[in-house]
C-alpha cells in the first residue's frame, strides 16, 4: 500500500514558504513524486501538460514569462492552474508573477516559494515524495540501527526479537520499529524501513507490556527510519537443523526489486543474542569494506595444506 501526501506535508518537510493559498494546503493531495518544469507549457503547448504534478518555476521559466504581455501571462497561467494541480513552487527567492497569483486564487492552487536553487529544491521534493508515495510492505520483525547499519530482526513469535532489541537499545543502539516494520524501496538499491505512526518508539515485552523507548532511554535511543542493510533471522535450535558455521553460505531475501543479505542465527538457552547480532553487524561492515574473515581462514588453511604436502613429499 502506498502512502499519501498533502501539500501541507510537503511544505513542512521541505521547508517551503507559503506565498498564497495557505488555507488550501491540507486539501490538496499530491499523487506523484514527479516534479514538472513547465517550459513548454509557457509557450502555449499543453498537449502533454502533466497537470497532476507539482509545478516548479525557476530562473529560466520566470525570465521567459517576463517577455509576455500581461494578458498572455494571465492566459497561460490560467491554463496551467488546473483543479488537479497540487501547487506551484518558485525557486531561488524569485518574485511571484501577479498573473500566477490571480490564476492560483481563481482555481484553488497554492503558490509556494523557497530561496533554494531549482536543482536543490527539486532534489529535496523528489526524495521526500518518493519515500512517502512509494508502495509499502509490512514485515513482522524488529528494526534496529546497530553501528549505523539497519538490521531487520525476523523470526517466529516468541523467539525473542523484542527482548533482543531491548538489550541492543541498552547497549547504545537505536530502535526504529518493533513488531511491524513498514518497508519501501527508495531507489534501485536502497530499502528503507520505518514504524507505523501508532507504534513509533514503542516496544512490547512479554510479561511487562508496552514500553516507550524514547521516554525510558532518551531521544538518542530511537530513529524515525533507516536503510535496511542486513536481515538477521532468529530460529529455534534443533539438533537436525544445519546452520552455517563458516559464514560462506550466502543468502538473500528480496523485497520489491532489492535483495538484502540474510543470516540465520539459532536461538538456544544461554546464548546472548544481542552480542551475537552486534558481531554479525560488525562482521557485515568489515566484509563491505573488503575484509572477509572466512576467505582469510580458507587462504590460511590452503597454505597450511600446501606446506604440509611439500613436507610430506620430501620424506
UniProtKB/Swiss-Prot annotation:
Catalytic activity: [HPr protein]-L-serine + ATP = [HPr protein]-O-phospho-L-serine + ADP + H(+); [HPr protein]-O-phospho-L-serine + phosphate + H(+) = [HPr protein]-L-serine + diphosphate
CC cofactor: Mg(2+)
Region (Important for the catalytic mechanism of dephosphorylation): 266-271
Active site, UniProt feature: 140, 161, 179, 245
Residues that hold ATP according to the record: 155-162
The protein's Enzyme Commission number: 2.7.11.-, 2.7.4.-
Keywords, sorted A to Z: ATP-binding, Carbohydrate metabolism, Kinase, Magnesium, Metal-binding, Multifunctional enzyme, Nucleotide-binding, Serine/threonine-protein kinase, Transferase
Cross-referenced Pfam families: Hpr_kinase_C, Hpr_kinase_N
Region (Important for the catalytic mechanism of both phosphorylation and dephosphorylation): 203-212
One Gene Ontology term of the molecular function aspect: phosphorelay sensor kinase activity
Binding site residues for Mg(2+): 162, 204
Subunit structure: Homohexamer.
More details: Both phosphorylation and phosphorolysis are carried out by the same active site and suggest a common mechanism for both reactions.
Family membership noted in the UniProt record: Belongs to the HPrK/P family.
Primary role: Catalyzes the ATP- as well as the pyrophosphate-dependent phosphorylation of a specific serine residue in HPr, a phosphocarrier protein of the phosphoenolpyruvate-dependent sugar phosphotransferase system (PTS). HprK/P also catalyzes the pyrophosphate-producing, inorganic phosphate-dependent dephosphorylation (phosphorolysis) of seryl-phosphorylated HPr (P-Ser-HPr).
Domain writeup: The Walker A ATP-binding motif also binds Pi and PPi.
Database matches in HAMAP family: HPr_kinase
Protein's recorded name: HPr kinase/phosphorylase
Phylogenetic lineage: Bacteria, Bacillati, Bacillota, Bacilli, Lactobacillales
